[in-house]
Amino acid sequence: MNFRVVGLAIALAVGLVSWVLTCAAWRFDHVTSGFLPLAPRAFERFTLVALGTAAAGEDQNRRGSAVAAGVGSDIALVDAGRDVAEALRAAKIPPSQPGAVLFTSLLPENTVGLDDLLAAAWLAGRRAPIRVIGPPGTAELARHVVAEITAGVVARARALGDDPAPPALDALEVGDGAREALGGLALRAAALGDGPLPALAWRIEAKGRSAVVGGTGWDGAALEQLARGADLLFHDANHVPSPEEAAAMSLDVDPERLRREAAFYTDFDEVGEIAQRAGVRTLVLYKMRQPAVLDLQVTSRVDDVYDGHIAVAHDGDEFTP
């Protein structure tokens, strides 16, 4: 008997079994992570999580706009776009954990996940109202969301023998300079004018670090003022072709529509200039209508005018200012 061959066969068999068991364990963890209860997540350092990075249009590769800011067990969301509950689970944050939602504006891409968040939080056992802070119109939005889901949420709770307390949002409408706090997070709003509806940018500070989430493409001067000296700036970045560029590319687009869209978004050069003048250490770009195939396609344009670190956010990315 060739013992060397037998030994090799045994080693291969053991390796194969180990590989199969490892794959099975990974598959089990992957499946169960989608429904098992999550323990509250604690952030040792002040951290921002890009839960969703899509712009207004549908994007099968990106969830709707939402950024989580956390320190310790205190978590605030900036905007609540589509699939926000799933995005929280992917980040290992229970949907019942965020204590507040800060809206940058009431554009639908920022708000359509609020009912999803509230329903998921109540299903997970939360019974304390979630704070919702935003521009004028936030209170009415909150009332509609609660009215939309209350009957179903309460009916299910009663059927399961759970606490049938109805879901609740504690809405607050704020303007320029408003200051709020959520545990270890200090929150400050700046109004962004010149847009089609009221909008805010948010500065969030914790443990001596600071981050600003802009989210809308107008009033760069106000955003620059709020972001002055910040460690990190989250903001949209989009290039809309000029009528001349569109003509050169043989695009059949109404020139007036292009001008209007350009006023709605922040161009690559502009966002870099805002960050440079404000002295921001790191610039994170999200909400791109047409995400680049390679991040370098974007960062190479912005770094012509900005000297700091540049990142293109993808769903699930985490940043520590």
Regions found by a protein language model. Give the residues of each.
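Cap/insert and terminal regions of metallo-dependent hydrolase folds
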Residues: 3-7, 11, 15, 210, ...
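Short, surface-exposed acidic/glycine-rich loop or hinge patches that mediate macromolecular interfaces
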Residues: 108, 137, 217, 288-289
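Binuclear metal-dependent hydrolase catalytic cores
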Residues: 2-212, 223, 297-320
